[in-house]
């Protein structure tokens, strides 16, 4: 059973928040079918994300998508980007596609839990799950990570450089992509 009060970022300490919006997903609302995984009736399309009001001194951003309710004991990372330049304020719908054409120059994508360098959509197997879309404002221009690092390693490094955090938490159900 999920603990809906569990916030995976709460134990990292408080940091200033800034604004994250989307043309495709909304905080507390179910995810549209196209943002589900292909195996669940979706298209693995990453949603549009736009942010503003990042803290002064922001030198780069990281973006992560995490399902803390996955039945793994450690959650499930759907997407992990880092080294987005400080002047980046938006990712268009589909930016998480495998070809990286819609990502800003210099942005790096780590393999997700499926070991794919792309966004992988929602696929809750058992019940409603939450999906944390998080933009992290960082105090360094770049993180030098092994390109095969896991999203958890990214999170560890992000923790020590976070100036602020913005998030949208969406939901998905096993039958959500079927309408």
Predicted regions mapped to residue ranges:
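N-terminus-centered regions that define maturation/targeting leaders and the start
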Residues: 1-179
